[in-house]
Regions:
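Bacterial N-terminal signal peptides that target proteins for export
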Residues: 1-9
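N-terminal signal peptide c-region/cleavage motif recognized by signal peptidases
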Residues: 15-17
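Active-site-proximal loop/helix of nucleotide/amide-processing enzymes and allied scaffolds
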Residues: 21-111, 120-156, 201-264
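Short coil/turn segments at the loop-to-beta-strand junctions that recur within blades
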Residues: 196-199
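Charge-rich, low-complexity terminal tails
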Residues: 174-177, 182, 189-194, 249, ...
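Hydrophobic, aromatic-enriched interface-forming segments
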Residues: 141-182
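A short, surface-exposed beta-strand/turn
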Residues: 95-113, 172-190
Length: 264
C-alpha cells in the first residue's frame, strides 16, 4: 500500500536569504546522547506517519470536503495519537477543526468526530498549522508530493519536517528532505537544516532465494545521522538495518528499532 501524501499547499518561489542555515559540518562525531535524540525524533516521525496515514483513511470513509479541510496536523496526547483536519481561519487567528481522528487500542485504529460548525483551536494545532504555512512559503515550489510533520522540539520550539511522499508501491524515497526549527507560535523560522540534498528512489531487489540484508547510503551535507534516516528504516518494508557513511569517514548502523550505533 502506498503511504499517505499530504501537502495540499500552494508553495511559493524560493525565498530564504535571511534564515540561519544548519549546513556546517560538525567537527566531532555525534555523542551517544545526540544519537539517542536522533533516534527519538525519528521514532516520533514514524509514529506520526502511521497515525496520519490511518487517520486519513478513517476520514476519507466519510467523504470529506477536501477544500474545506486542506490541512492535517497530528499530536501525541496521553500516549495516543490525535489527528485533526481543517484550515486556518480567514483572519489567521485560529485553526478551524472539521474532523478529529482519535487513535484506539491499535496503531491503525481511529475513530472520527465531525464538527459542524468547525471547532476553534488557538493552541498546538493553530501554531503547528501556522508553522507549516510559514515554512512551506520558504521551501518553495516542489516538483513532487511531500508530507509535512510537526513535532515539539527539545527546547520548547517546533520542528517542521518536509519528507518526500511515497508515489510507487515498494519504493521508499530517501533524501531531498528538510527540517525547520520554528518559534512556538509558528510565525518565525529560527533555522533550517537540509538533511539530504538529492532523492534516492529505487526498489530494493534481490535474487530468487535471497533476502535483503540492509541498505546503505552516504551523507555529503552533514556528519550526522539524520532524523529522516531513522524514519526511513522504521517505515521501509521489509524492515532491515541501514548503514550510513558520513563525510568525515565515520560509519553508523541504524537498527530496525531505530537505535544508532557507531561502527567506525
Amino acid at each position: 500500500m502506498i503511504r499517505r501524501m499530504m501537502l495540499p499547499l500552494v508553495l511559493l518561489a524560493w525565498c530564504c536569504p535571511l534564515i540561519a542555515q544548519e549546513y556546517k559540518k560538525e567537527s566531532t562525531p555525534p555523542s551517544p546522547a545526540q544519537l539517542a535524540a536522533t533516534t527519538a525524533r525519528g521514532r516520533m516521525l514514524a509514529e506520526y506517519d502511521v497515525a496520519a496515514w490511518h487517520a486519513t483513511d478513517a476520514v476519507e470513509a466519510l467523504k470529506p470536503d477536501h477544500a474545506a479541510a486542506p490541512l492535517s496536523v497530528a499530536r501525541k496526547v496521553g500516549g495516543k495519537w490525535e489527528v485533526v483536519f481543517g484550515r486556518l481561519s480567514p483572519e489567521r487567528d485560529k485553526f478551524l477543526i472539521l474532523y478529529r481522528a482519535s487513535q484506539g487500542a491499535a496503531p491503525e485504529d481511529f475513530s472520527v468526530k465531525k464538527f459542524d460548525p468547525p471547532a476553534d483551536d488557538r493552541g498546538f494545532y493553530f501554531h503547528a498549522s501556522k508553522a507549516i504555512e510559514t515554512t512551506a512559503k520558504d521551501l518553495g515550489k516542489l516538483a513532487r508530493p511531500y508530507n509535512s510533520y510537526v513535532l515539539p522540539s527539545e527546547n520548547g520550539q517546533l520542528y517542521v519536517y518536509f519528507l518526500p511522499g511515497q508515489t510507487t508501491e515498494g519504493v521508499y524515497p530517501l533524501g531531498g528532505d528538510v527540517r525547520y526549527t520554528v518559534t512556538l507560535d509558528g510565525s518565525t523560522i529560527a533555522s533550517k537544516r537540509q538533511m539530504h540534498k538529492t532523492i534516492v528512489e529505487k526498489k530494493d531487489s534481490v535474487q530468487p532465494g535471497q533476502q535483503l540484508a540492509g541498505g546503505y547510503h552516504t551523507h555529503v551535507l552533514n556528519n550526522d545521522v539524520e532524523d529522516s534516516d531513522v524514519f526511513h528504516v522504521l517505515t521501509r518494508i521489509p524492515l532491515v538495518p541501514e548503514i550510513v557513511g558520513t563525510a568525515d569517514k565515520h560509519v553508523y548502523e541504524i537498527r530496525t528499532d531505530g537505535s544508532i550505533t557507531r561502527e567506525k
